[in-house]
Each structure stands twice: as structure tokens, then as C-alpha cells.
Amino acid sequence: MRKRNESVTVEHERAAAAPAPLDKGCSLRHSLRLPAADTGMKRPLGRRHGLWFRLRRLIIWLLGVYIAIPFLVKLCPAIQAKLVFLNFVRVPYFIDLKRPQDQGLNHTCNYYLQPEEDVTIGVWHTVPAALWKNARGKDQLWFEDALGSSHPVILYLHGNAGTRGGDHRVELYKVLSSLGYHVVTFDYRGWGDSVGSPSERGMTYDALHVFDWIKARSGDNPVYIWGHSLGTGVATNLVRRLCERETPPEALILESPFTNIREEARSHPFSVIYRYFPGFDWFFLDPITTSGIKFANDENVKYISCSLLILHAEDDPVVPFHLGKKLYNIAATSRSFRDYKVQFVPFHTDLGYRHKYIYRSPELPRILREFLGIPEHEHHH
């Protein structure tokens, strides 16, 4: 009996000392919970690391592009030339330049002239408002003969981008026509429907060809030259050449002009992100002059002998106002203008005329009448 009791006691103690068997369900639950909790902690960390990696990769890529662009421009000066001319930007789109009436110019004729072999330029000739009714249904010969009527002529040289059918340009033609002027404008070679490759020399030669074409038909009527933005560079090139051959226009009007293309490029909003880049001039400005593009208005005005009117809006975001003012100061002190009128007309920021809306000014007709004089036909009214 004692042995049996002792064996029972030993077995009882062994059983008590042995660990209790774990519940299978409980064990499974624990084994599942622990990895799940661990994964939940790792997932946000993984997301954050992945987001940071992508952001870092984007920053490195953008930095690489930022650094590569100056070298690309330096190695390919033609890129800068295209950015100066922007002749590939044809706005407004889908207009037929052969049909100026589609732009509300019912008193306008479309011509094509050939300044050089393999170069053809599209020209618009808008007659004065007094001739609108007579112009209906007339052909090119009638319009050419009309240049000999007693109305002054304005040769308009537009800026970069777009065509002769640009909205703000068309609105200016209408204003000038209503004031009694013929308006002749054209697209330089490489712009609009004009054939050829753009260059400063080519643009200037196109303008000279159109000027001579006008003078051959306008008799003794005054011919004025009006340049806007990049067109001011063409205008001063042209007028300097005309003065050198002693056939100057009656007056030169520069709207939103700059001093020279290097200073304009340095001040242009596109250059902001690179303006303080080491070697900015070497990377960005030298390739422009390497391409033969100077448009040196500040030099040209020293050789121009005719009346000069400069119009500039203070809030111009493309050609800064101070460049127009600087050009005026150079011209006003130049000996070449000592016998001619030089006038600068600013337009206050509050008016909101910016780079291309000076035509909206109700003061513009008065400014032109006082500077150019009243067109002869208006004396009869």
C-alpha cells in the first residue's frame, strides 16, 4: 500500500512539474498575430521609403536636365536662334492667310512678293477706312494703285511668333486704317505662309524689299515704319540702311523696343531660372550672337536721321520698360537726331497694356496725330 501511494505521489508530482499542454487554437492565434503586427509596422515605413526614393530620383533627374540644357544650347546655337524667332509658333491656328476677310479685314488684299530667289513672302495691304467701300471686290491691281492716293502708308513689322494674322496685330491694323493710313504688313521668310529660313539678315532684306515696293507705288505720300518687339530690331536695321542710302522714311515708330538682343534675352522671363547660373552669358547669350543675331537697336539709332516715336507700357513682362527708356535716352542724345523729333510715350501699369495691347489706348490716335500730323485727306472733313 505504501509503495503504491508513493508511486501515485511521484506521478502526481511529475504531472504537476510538467508544463501544461498549450491549446492548439491559442498557439495558432499567437503565431498569426505576431507577424501581422510586425507587417503593419513595416508597411508605412516601406511606403515612406518608396516615396522618398521616387522623390529623390525626380529631383536628381530635374537637376540633371537643368544642368544639361546650358550645354545643349552651347553645343547647338540653332536652338537659341529658334527661341529668338519662335517662327514655328503659328497662332492663331487654322486660319487661311490668303483670306484676311476671315479676320474681319474686308478691305485688305493678300499679295505674294519675292525678295530673293527661293524666298516668297505673304503680304497684307489694308486700305484706309475712307476707301473701304470702294475696295469691295477689287483685285490686286486696284489695291496697288490705291497706294498712290493721298493717304500716308505705315509699313508694320511684327514681332516673333505668330503671323501677320495675329489678333493684336489685326486690331492695330484696324485702328491705323480708321485714322486714314494704308497699312502694309508681311510675314518674314519662315513665318506664316512665307517661304525661306529665318535670319536677321533675311528679315531685314524682306523689309527693305517691301519698303521699296511701297515707294514704287506710293508716289510722294509719306511712308512711316512701325516695328513691334522683335520687329523693332528689323525696323532699326532697315531705317539705318535707308538713311545710309539717303532714302529715309518720314518717321520711325518703335513699340515695346529693346536695346539689343543680348540685353533683351538677359531680361526675358524665360531666362529667370538661369540668370544667376555660372557662365550665363557664355552658355546662353554667346550662342545667339554666334548665330548672327544682334538686333542692335542701341547702335542703329546712332545712324538714323528721321523722327522717332517710342511707345512702351510700364507693365510689359516680355521687354522690360527700362530697356525702352534706355533706348530713348541713347537716341535723344545722339547727334543723328539733332534735327528731328524724338519722343517717348509711357503707358501706366494701371492701364494693363502689357506687351501687345497698346492699340487699345484711347490716347493712341491723338498721340499719332500730334507726332505724325493729320493725314491729308482728313483736312477735307
Curated annotation (Swiss-Prot):
This protein's name: Lysophosphatidylserine lipase ABHD12
GO biological-process terms attached to the record: acylglycerol catabolic process; monoacylglycerol catabolic process; phosphatidylserine catabolic process; phospholipid catabolic process
Disulfide linkage: none
Glycosylation sites: 106
GO terms, molecular function: lysophospholipase activity; monoacylglycerol lipase activity; phospholipase activity
Annotated compartments: Endoplasmic reticulum membrane
This protein's UniProt keywords: Endoplasmic reticulum, Glycoprotein, Hydrolase, Lipid metabolism, Membrane, Transmembrane, Transmembrane helix
Residues annotated as transmembrane: 59-79
UniProt EC number: 3.1.-.-, 3.1.1.23
Record's function text: Lysophosphatidylserine (LPS) lipase that mediates the hydrolysis of lysophosphatidylserine, a class of signaling lipids that regulates immunological and neurological processes. Represents a major lysophosphatidylserine lipase in the brain, thereby playing a key role in the central nervous system. Also able to hydrolyze oxidized phosphatidylserine; oxidized phosphatidylserine is produced in response to severe inflammatory stress and constitutes a proapoptotic 'eat me' signal.
Membrane topology listed for this record: Single-pass membrane protein
Any one of the GO CC terms: membrane
Extracellular side: 80-381
Catalytic activity: 1-(9Z-octadecenoyl)-sn-glycero-3-phospho-L-serine + H2O = sn-glycero-3-phospho-L-serine + (9Z)-octadecenoate + H(+); 1-(9Z-octadecenoyl)-sn-glycero-3-phospho-(1'-sn-glycerol) + H2O = sn-glycero-3-phospho-(1'-sn-glycerol) + (9Z)-octadecenoate + H(+); 1-(9Z-octadecenoyl)-sn-glycero-3-phospho-(1D-myo-inositol) + H2O = sn-glycero-3-phospho-1D-myo-inositol + (9Z)-octadecenoate + H(+); 1-(9Z-octadecenoyl)-sn-glycero-3-phosphoethanolamine + H2O = sn-glycero-3-phosphoethanolamine + (9Z)-octadecenoate + H(+)
Family note: Belongs to the serine esterase family.
Entries under InterPro entries matching the protein: AB_hydrolase_1 (IPR000073), AB_hydrolase_fold (IPR029058)
Catalytic residues (UniProt): 229 (nucleophile), 316 (charge relay system), 355 (charge relay system)
Cytoplasmic compartment segments: 1-58
Species annotation: Gallus gallus (Chicken)
